[in-house]
Amino acid sequence: KSKLKGQKQILLVGLFVFVTLMTIGYAAFNTNITLHVKGNIKTKPVDIGGVDVTPVTEGDGLYEDEYEEGRYVYRGSNPNNYIMFNNELWRIISKEADGTYKIIRNDVLSNRAFDERNHRSTDNNSYCTDPQYGCGVYAAVSGTFLSPSGSQSGTVTEDSSIKIYLNDDYYVNNINSTAKDQMTSHSFNIGAVENLNQSGAEEDSIEKNIAGEKMYTWTGNVGLANVSDILRASTNPLCTSATTSFNGYKECNSNYLLDKGSASLLNYWTINASSYESGGNSHYAWYGFANSSHASVSNYGAYYSSRAPRPVVFLKSDTTLNGSGTPDDPFTIV
């Protein structure tokens, strides 16, 4: 009996050791497999006109848009988003969810008013309460044009002077026939972006800015950048809203859309009207601004001719590209 008892003890100890070793071995094996798999996960490239571009999560490059599903945006100080269009350098702002490409001219055009004095009368445009100072709405809309808070409202039955210039003059006379064939008419979000004074849960955000922009659309050939295009292009985590940028200095830097290059100053109109909760500023429009100490969005009277148009168009979804998107090897349309 004693001998049998000893054999049982040896058997139990052996079984315990075996089970322990198997458990440790499995855990080690499983850990190795898990680490191996994680270490080989790769971000799926995005098709940019037939060129595979791998999205990034930091630094300059192509990002998945965190605000709109299916959309990709270029961000940072100088991402590789240069494209030759109309025999000029432009930049790709985004690949839209519908597959089209939103592009912006690398250089601004000559300064001009967003909306010339008395271009739109109050009789036909009741939103435009100060026609002698112009009006901040890009194009005519049906029904009533409202600011996000509803503090400003009225009809806008006529287009801004800058919209007429870009589509009836610039598009006709300055975009060549090849480029026209590469473009597509597209909707632009022309709603107002509101400057908010609240804090906490009621404070401004890029989500609110986008929602304001999307309240009204215009479909056509040539527009301007959205306020949110400029904000989303920044990799500075402090760039959280139009209000933050307006009240600050460089919260929205690290941003190719606010790169003044060798110039002393960059001033260009966006496509969005500016509004305040208090109302009474129908003649204001947003613009992008950069100098030696600032990189931000701000607003200004639409009748001033000290800001420039910076044209934005959309390329067709079946656009095919060559190149790497660098200044020396920009994307080219084939």
Protein language model annotation of sequence segments:
Residues 1-2:
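N-terminal secretory signal peptides that target proteins for export/translocation
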Residues 5-51, 324-327:
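Short, polar/proline-rich extracytoplasmic segments that appear immediately after membrane translocation
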Residues 46-334:
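Long, domain-scale functional regions
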